[in-house]
């Protein structure tokens, strides 16, 4: 189909070209062609195609194939096939009907379609054409019919441009290029400026972040200096934590173990639960218990943190320094080897005596594992870490401490009056017992958990005979009356809190006494049948009066390093002595002066304070390490492993700047004077000693 169409088009183009050539050739003959009267009517400029068409339509002989319509405005070709076969070869040298119709369209003829003329009749082979200037009896109008110009010629005419237009276009292009170059340069400059601005913004942001960090650090530092309690950095905690295998607890825990393993000291065994029924109902001569507890006078429960190895003791058993002869009845003895003693919290401590030549007697009070239930009427207790530190709260705490000091002073005065009235002779006293006076009258009886004390005779050896009264550490005379009891205590703690905690423990857990031949080798049991009051023998002033006749030139003893003597092992500590107690007092005064100078320096302006540096100066491990004291059982206790989960240690936080920058100079003077008074009027506990 495509090939047939292409061939048909080629034939059509060939006929058209031939027709055009014929038209050009026949223009001149057609001008001279005149038939009868129509020759004068057709003009000289009429194309041959139009002249031939006019002759065919107007000829009556060809009406059967082509003729005018009734109105004479158009002509009709009735039989196209026969017309193409018979008439076209005679006039146009071809028999292609399509080429003839195309020529008519080129000269402006239009096909007329109507309802009557084949619009709805497909069986009729007729076709009608019309032109405004092709009419019957009007041949003179043929000159106005013009052939349409071909597309190729129009394209050639339009493709030719004038030089003026071309030059104008070139100038416009040059202007546009200049503008584009200008815009490109501006865009590049803007990009560079934008990059510079972004870099400056990044640098400024970094500087701003650094400045903000510096300001925040300065604000936090100032807040910690001015108000350290707000961020809980300066709060002292007195609550004990469960920590395993700490050096301080190992020392305190293994003290009794080393003494018992040495073979020369008493062995204390705690009863199990299945043996309590046998112990709760002993014979009257072997067991006596009395305990009084005043619920209304109970101070709030507080936990006393240990200060040194000398002050760390078991919280379940309280060992006092009070001598046995103050509490034993004269002439009252037992025949058994094991003595069961019930402790009492009242001042009238009851005990059972035995001949010191056969066995050692101890008065022991075992405290319960947990505190007694809090009395509903007792005042609430607030720890320092839960109390907001404000000037009003500080003032109230200062008032409470002053009131507590006055009460203690009144108790000491009352004890002195009783001692002066009764002429009681006291050999040794404990400062803990002075806080439990005048309370036994209203205290109800409380049964304390008993303990079995197994008394074993000491193994005498030749080394004991070499000791003289001057160098015997076991003798009572070794204790100096000028030695302070708080030499191993932490002086940085508030005195009011310390005294309240000790008083509370004395009221709850009672007074107990432990003495042995180690501490008093020879003593006489009093012959009086009455018991001595523990409070009367516990005041510091009474102890000072009773020991006024002792030697005043005693030196202060300290343990350090190792000793190469013959009487002790190489692992034991060396006994060093200071020249006099006055040197200790002078050292304390110099340290106090240095602290005052440091306070004045810190109060001055322009002093850069590093909080971490100041806190590092007050490391607990340095301050609380027994003040330079070491003991022979340290190496032994370090090798032993404590059972997991059975130790208690106090949590000691870093010291606060508020303790150093305290502006209350009057309170500091009072505390310094009180410490000096206690130093002069107190008696040091018997130092530990091991074989």
Swiss-Prot record:
**Record's GO cellular component, any one?**
chromatin
Residues that the record marks as modified (Phosphothreonine) are: 258
* Region of interest: Disordered: 1-31, 288-307, 658-691
PTM sites of type Phosphoserine = 256, 260, 283, 299, 580
Question: Signal peptide location in the record?
Answer: none
Q: Name one Pfam family in it.
A: Vert_HS_TF
Asked if the record carries the keyword Cytoplasm, the reply is no
Composition skew (Acidic residues), residue ranges: 18-27, 659-668
Q: Name one GO biological process term.
A: positive regulation of DNA-templated transcription
Q: Which residues mediate DNA binding here?
A: 46-150
Family matches, as SUPFAM superfamilies = Winged helix' DNA-binding domain
* GO MF, any single term: sequence-specific DNA binding
Record keywords, A-Z:
Activator, DNA-binding, Nucleus, Phosphoprotein, Stress response, Transcription, Transcription regulation
* PROSITE patterns, per database record: HSF_DOMAIN
Describe its PTM? Exhibits temperature-dependent phosphorylation.
Q: What does this protein's UniProt record list under function?
A: DNA-binding protein that specifically binds heat shock promoter elements (HSE) and activates transcription. In higher eukaryotes, HSF is unable to bind to the HSE unless the cells are heat shocked.
Q: What is this protein called?
A: Heat shock factor protein
- Organism of provenance: Drosophila melanogaster (Fruit fly)
């Amino acid at each position: 189909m495509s090939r047939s169409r292409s061939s048909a088009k080629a034939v059509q183009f060939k006929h058209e070209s031939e027709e055009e050539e014929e038209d050009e050739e026949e223009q001149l003959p057609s001008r001279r062609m005149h038939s009868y009267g129509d020759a004068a009517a057709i003009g000289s400029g009429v194309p041959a195609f139009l002249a031939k068409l006019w002759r065919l339509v107007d000829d009556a002989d060809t009406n059967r194939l082509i003729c005018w319509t009734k109105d004479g405005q158009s002509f009709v070709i009735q039989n196209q096939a026969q017309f193409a076969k018979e008439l076209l070869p005679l006039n146009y040298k071809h028999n292609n009907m399509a080429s003839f119709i195309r020529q008519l369209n080129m000269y402006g003829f239009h096909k007329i379609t109507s309802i009557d003329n084949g619009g709805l009749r497909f069986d009729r082979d007729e076709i009608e054409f019309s032109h405004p200037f092709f009419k019957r009896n009007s041949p003179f109008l043929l000159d106005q019919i013009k052939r349409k110009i071909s597309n190729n010629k129009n394209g050639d005419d339009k493709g030719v441009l004038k030089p003026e237009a071309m030059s104008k276009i070139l100038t416009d292009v040059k202007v546009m290029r200049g503008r584009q170059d200008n815009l490109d340069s501006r865009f590049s400059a803007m990009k560079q400026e934008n990059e510079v601005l972004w870099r400056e913004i990044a640098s400024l942001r970094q500087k701003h972040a650094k400045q903000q960090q510096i300001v925040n650090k300065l604000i936090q530092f100032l807040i910690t200096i001015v108000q350290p309690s707000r961020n809980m950095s300066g709060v002292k905690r007195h609550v004990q934590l469960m920590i395993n295998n700490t050096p301080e607890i190992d020392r305190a825990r293994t003290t009794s173990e080393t003494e018992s393993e040495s073979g020369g000291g008493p062995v204390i065994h705690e009863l199990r639960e299945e043996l309590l029924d046998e112990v709760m109902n002993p014979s009257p001569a072997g067991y006596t218990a009395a305990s009084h507890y005043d619920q209304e006078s109970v101070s709030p429960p507080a936990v006393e943190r240990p200060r040194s190895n000398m002050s760390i003791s078991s919280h379940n058993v309280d060992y006092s320094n009070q001598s046995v002869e103050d509490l034993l009845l004269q002439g009252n003895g037992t025949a058994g080897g094991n003595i069961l003693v019930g402790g009492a919290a009242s001042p009238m401590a009851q005990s059972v005596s035995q001949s010191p030549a056969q066995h050692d007697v101890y008065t022991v009070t075992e405290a319960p594992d947990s505190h007694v239930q809090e009395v509903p009427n007792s005042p609430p207790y607030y720890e320092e870490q839960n109390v907001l530190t404000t000037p009003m709260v500080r003032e109230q705490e200062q008032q409470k401490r002053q009131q507590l000091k006055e009460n203690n002073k009144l108790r000491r005065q009352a004890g002195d009056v009783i001692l002066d009235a009764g002429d009681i002779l006291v050999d040794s006293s404990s400062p803990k017992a002075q806080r439990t006076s005048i309370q036994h009258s209203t205290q109800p009886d409380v049964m304390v958990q008993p303990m079995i004390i197994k008394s074993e005779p000491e193994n005498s050896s030749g080394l004991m005979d070499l000791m003289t009264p001057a160098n015997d550490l076991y003798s009572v005379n070794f204790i100096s009356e000028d030695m302070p009891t708080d030499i191993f205590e932490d002086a940085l703690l508030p005195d009011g809190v310390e005294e309240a905690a000790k008083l509370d423990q004395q009221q709850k857990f009672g007074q107990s006494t432990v003495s042995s031949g180690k501490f008093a080798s020879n003593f006489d049991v009093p012959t009086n049948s009455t018991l001595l009051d523990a409070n009367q023998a516990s005041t510091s002033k009474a102890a000072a009066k009773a020991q006024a006749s002792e030697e005043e030139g005693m030196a202060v003893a300290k343990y350090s390093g190792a000793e190469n003597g013959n009487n002790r092992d190489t692992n034991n500590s060396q006994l060093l002595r200071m020249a006099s107690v006055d040197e200790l007092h002078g050292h304390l005064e110099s340290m106090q002066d240095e602290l005052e100078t440091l306070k004045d320096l810190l109060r001055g302006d322009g002093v850069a304070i590093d909080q971490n540096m100041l806190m590092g100066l007050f490391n607990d491990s340095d301050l609380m390490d027994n003040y330079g004291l070491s003991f022979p059982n340290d190496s032994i206790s370090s090798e032993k492993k404590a059972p997991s989960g059975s130790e208690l240690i106090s949590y000691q936080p870093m010291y606060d700047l508020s303790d150093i920058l305290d502006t209350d100079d009057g309170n500091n003077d009072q505390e310094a004077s009180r410490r000096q008074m206690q130093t002069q009027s107190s008696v040091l506990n018997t130092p530990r000693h091991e074989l």
